Curated annotation (Swiss-Prot):
Principal place of residence: membrane
Family to which this protein belongs: Belongs to the COX11/CtaG family.
Entry protein name: Cytochrome c oxidase assembly protein CtaG
Membrane topology: Single-pass type II membrane protein
Pfam family, one: CtaG_Cox11
Functional description taken from the UniProt entry: Exerts its effect at some terminal stage of cytochrome c oxidase synthesis, probably by being involved in the insertion of the copper B into subunit I.
Gene this chain is encoded by: ctaG
Record-level Gene Ontology MF annotations: copper ion binding
Length: 202
């Protein structure tokens, strides 16, 4: 076979390799974009970055004499007709002390509504040391028309906060919640007996 005949074939193979590399790059970028949000969320939960609090299963074994002022903020996003507020606007626990506070939500609409609370701590440097043992934000909340619900939050401030350079001078932190609407079960059809079938969202 002459060099002239082999050249087009070689060029064709090279072009095919380039196409495959481009396709692999496109699919790879798509996969990275899809995974970016959950990976970022995990990163924030592990590091406390961007004011994300920590979820723990056990209480602190160390309690310091120093206290931390903790204030609370409650918000409701459009689409959810709820009143939502903290029972207490602020508390002053000792650092390392486990404490329970309560929030109250009331459905002012004439239909059952489902909400999911999203939380944040400011200043952001305190997020890694704000440990939640129990919180209504771990699950979705359903409220019937006119229903009023008191919801607890159990937390403590990690004593390590006084050792870190970026957080040792923090004396006040704010825990903020925003409730967002979530879709619940929807009536989709009626059977012959007149009862409503419920479709559960997966």
């Amino acid at each position: 076979m002459s060099d002239k005949a082999a050249a087009p074939r070689k060029q064709g193979r090279n072009n095919g390799a380039v196409v495959m590399m481009c396709l692999s790059f496109v699919f790879g970028m798509g996969a990275m974009s899809y995974a970016a949000v959950p990976l970022y969320r995990i990163f924030c939960q592990v590091t406390g970055y961007n004011g994300t609090t920590q979820r723990v299963e056990q209480m602190s074994s160390v309690v310091l004499d120093r206290k931390m002022r903790v204030t609370f903020d409650a918000n409701v996003a459009p689409g959810l007709q709820w009143n939502f507020k903290p029972v207490e606007r602020e508390v002053n626990p000792k650092i390392g002390e486990t404490i329970q506070v309560n929030f109250v939500a009331e459905n002012k609409s004439n239909e059952t509504q489902r909400g999911q609370a999203v939380f944040n701590v400011t200043p952001g440097e305190a997020g890694a040391y704000f440990n939640k043992v129990q919180c209504f934000c771990f699950t979705e909340t359903d409220l019937k028309p006119g229903e009023k619900l008191e919801m607890p939050v159990v937390f403590y401030i990690d004593p390590e906060i006084v050792k870190a350079v970026e957080s040792k001078d923090i004396h006040t932190v704010t825990l903020s919640y925003t409730f967002y609407p979530k879709e619940g079960p929807k009536p989709v059809a009626s059977n012959e007996g007149g009862t409503v079938k419920i479709e559960k969202k997966l």
